[in-house]
Amino acid sequence: MFRRKLTALEYHNPTGFDCKDETEFRNFIVWLEDQKIRHYKIEDRGNLRNIPSSDWPKYFEKYLQDVNCPFSVQERQETVDWLLGLAVRFEYGDNVEKYRNCKPVTETNDVQKSADPLINLDSNNPDFKAGVLALANLLKIQRHDDYLVMLKAIKILVQERLTPDAIAKASQAKEGLPVTLDKHILGFDTGDATLNEAAQVLRLLHIEELRELQTKINEAIVAVQAIIADPKTDHRLGKVGR
């Protein structure tokens, strides 16, 4: 809850801080006052530094009043968050020239954004939903409750079917090769040579349809694997890439 502010203040344990641990909490308050806020003079911080004292909560309550904290001692999380915010403001004020010259780290963010353009899309935007539905209908893609899933399916289909390379390969595949019916045994005889040839043609066409069906099944498996391989997919909750 407080990790970012604690990290900004260079606290020694920003990820493991537990404000519910009384000793850790008191030590943290002392550190915050000594190193960052410095509201009291050094000689006036003795009561706060006396961590084992049974009167410490009373002194802490007075400290909150002195720094004009709007929260009470009982509201510990809110108090910690407010004091951290105060400390961050003081930290910036003490080092204004240092932070003024800092350049924003935009290059890394741009690389991350370009790595997956779907990350920053608002899937609840009506225009986004309408656009995805229009594309899905145009490409005859099955509808899904999650519009991001539909968009990923569209992306996969476009990459595999509609890129210049994919179109070129598809055109080459359609050219085909001449087939000699004599090399394909029918397995039965109708008693009519013309009917035998027709049966052979139908069988070859059926085999071609089965191959196309298998190709589509393989593509569907690849598409599903691409979705479930998303590190943001939560299989337990049935949520994909959120």
Curated annotation (Swiss-Prot):
Localization, per the record, is: Nucleus; Cytoplasm, Cytosol; Cytoplasm, Perinuclear region; Cytoplasm, Cytoskeleton, Microtubule organizing center, Centrosome
Q: Which UniProt keywords apply?
A: Cytoplasm, Cytoskeleton, Nucleus, RNA-binding, Transcription, Transcription regulation
The superkingdom of the source organism is Eukaryota
Listed InterPro entries? RTRAF (IPR019265)
Record bears the keyword RNA-binding: yes
Q: Which GO molecular function annotations are given, in alphabetical order?
A: RNA binding; RNA polymerase II complex binding
What is any one of the record's Gene Ontology cellular component terms? Answer: tRNA-splicing ligase complex
What is an annotated GO biological process for this record, any one?
positive regulation of transcription by RNA polymerase II
Q: Which family does it belong to?
A: Belongs to the RTRAF family.
Task performed by this protein: RNA-binding protein involved in modulation of mRNA transcription by Polymerase II. Component of the tRNA-splicing ligase complex.
Instruction: Give the record's subunit note.
Output: Homodimer. Component of a tRNA-splicing ligase complex.
Q: What is this protein called?
A: RNA transcription, translation and transport factor protein
Q: What is the lineage of its organism?
A: Eukaryota, Metazoa, Chordata, Craniata, Vertebrata
